[in-house]
Amino acid sequence: EIVDCDWSSDVCSSDLRRQAVIRIRFSLVFIFLWIGLTACEHKDLCYDHPHFATVRVIFDWTKISNHDKPEGMRVVFYPTDDESNTWIFDFPGGEDGEVELPENVYRVICFNYDTVGMVWKENGSYTLFTADTRDVRSPDNRTMAVTPPWLCGDHIDRVILKDIPGGSAEIVRLTPVNMVCHYTYEVNGLRGLDRVADLRAALSGMSGSLNMSGDSLPADLSESLLFDGMVSRNQIIGGFYTFGHSALEGEPNVFRLYIKNRSGSMSVLEQDVSDQVHDVPVAGHIGDVHLVLNFDYEVPSEPGNGGPGFDVDVDDWDDVNVDIVL
């Protein structure tokens, strides 16, 4: 039944006020329920979403004195609870910079990224991450390894990036150190060097890989390194980088020199240089060595079976131009 209401009567006014109060109460209940549900949903999203930390990475270059700063540095953050979810950042010129990554506990490795020819293995694992070198065939068909490029780096076993106050940055300080040795050599007592068309050299009892987080050599690895050289007046000279001599006990270091004359004949000279290698003090695996080899040999002029050069892919060579003070 519809009753017309006299808007000027007290009865109608009372009914209207009562209906208005009921509507307001229902509206308030709805609003509070909506706020509560929204707050719960936001709270869940907040817990599910990782908080990011601002990190300022600082490079301390005081321990690099014999080499220019690299083209850039790569920093890898390994979460301790999930190494597969690494965070990788590049810093051109090795300059300091700020990055953001989820709050967590990390282990960190850094190294220069201008390392053409390096083979990186197990880079998804902090403890197994390895710098390796490629295999190559020597002029007498032996399996050897190429020499690595210059490498520097650092590692930190534990970095806690949690509960960092808003608006502030956590500092991660990295101090790169030299991670390769510098070997140079001179060969004396050779005659007929004007007949040399090509040459290579090798050194056995060396390590062709390096564990990055331990800055250490594999305990069970011994390889021969193959490298370049040049004729300089009455000598053959050269230089190369290496991770160091093998950690295996009793492994000899034999220097082999491959010479091809202009008629295609190959000569192979060798000499044990173990004493020269091991007499140099090392810090860890690092120790620069200068090898002096003395032969009494004349490069023949007779023709051989092959051409005047070695059949080696030039991409397998990482030549090092060095100033050698004799």
What spans do the regions from the language model cover?
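Bacterial N-terminal signal peptides that target proteins for export
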Residues: 17-27
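Short, low-hydrophobicity acidic/polar segments
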Residues: 85-178
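Single conserved hydrophobic/aromatic residue that forms the stacking wall/gate
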Residues: 1-15
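Hydrophilic extracytoplasmic domains
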Residues: 250-326
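Bacterial Sec-dependent N-terminal signal peptides
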Residues: 33-63, 317-323
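Structural motif
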Residues: 58-70, 186-194
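Tryptophan-paired
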Residues: 74-122, 197-278
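A sequence/structural signal for flexible, mid-protein segments enriched
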Residues: 145-236
